[in-house]
Amino acid sequence: MTRATPTARWVLLFGVAFGAAALVLPFVGPFGLNLENVRTRQEPDWSIFVQLRVSRTLLGLFAGGALSLAGTLFQAMLRDALATPYTLGISAGASLGAVVAIWLGWQQIAGVPAIWVAALGGAAVVLALVVGAALHHRRVSSFSLLLSGLAASSVCSAFILVIYGLVSTTKSFSISRWLIGSVDSVDYAALGGFVLVVVVTAAVVMRQAKAWNLMAVDPSWASTRGARVTQLTLSGYGAGSLLTAATVALTGPIGFVGLVVPHLVRTRIGADHRVLMPCAFLGGGVLLAACDAIGRSVVAPSEIPAGAVMAILGGPYLVWVLRQRSMS
């Protein structure tokens, strides 16, 4: 019998945690559910379990995984352990697109929820502008990319504030609630489409893990080792933007997942993307789903949005990381 390698054991461990979260967290909430009532589909426990708890747990798992994997990609491309989708303004662009859709009352575009299309469009426009601003002699400067991303985030945030001041009270409440970032219940049709996008994108990215190991060292060196640097970079930005925009469209902007999880996983298991990517995906999902479970339990019957819980945990962690960097 073949023994599992240490790297395989890490992936298995995170996979078990992901599965356990999917099974246990739907039962965590402001009031308990009777397991026997759920098993026999008795109301109201069955409806609460299926329509509320399971859907938001699954959304938390896959949204957290998507944000964490996107953060891992951007950190590899920029060779900066603190890079996130927020760093490049992609999350802000997706947020602006979604807010515009809410403001204008768009429902569907070509049969697809308008907020999805608008978020993806906003992310794509910001990415194109940021990369274009940082492009010099067909090479992208990481420093210029970061500065362009910060500028784009500021501009998008300003436009969001302008729109917020123009909309009606009802829409302003919807926008402010959405901007907090949460994994409130979503219908299964939207959830199914989101999960499909995330799983397919994650599978494509993880198949390129070996090439990302080379890219994380140095793109020039990676090209001498046979990596198609330009193609890989474009696919990385595209995949990271798609994961971010798809998540923001359903959950609103949720910060720190794409920073905290890849950084923690990398410090514990190393920088081999063949292990880092799946573990970061699984770990990010567990973290965000757990934050949602905490938020709906600690001040019951009220709730704290998952984005707020994540910020409470992630903010001090970022300060600690920056302090460790300055000391070293």
Walk through the language-model features, giving the residues of each:
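Alpha-helical transmembrane segments in inner-membrane proteins
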Residues: M1-S328
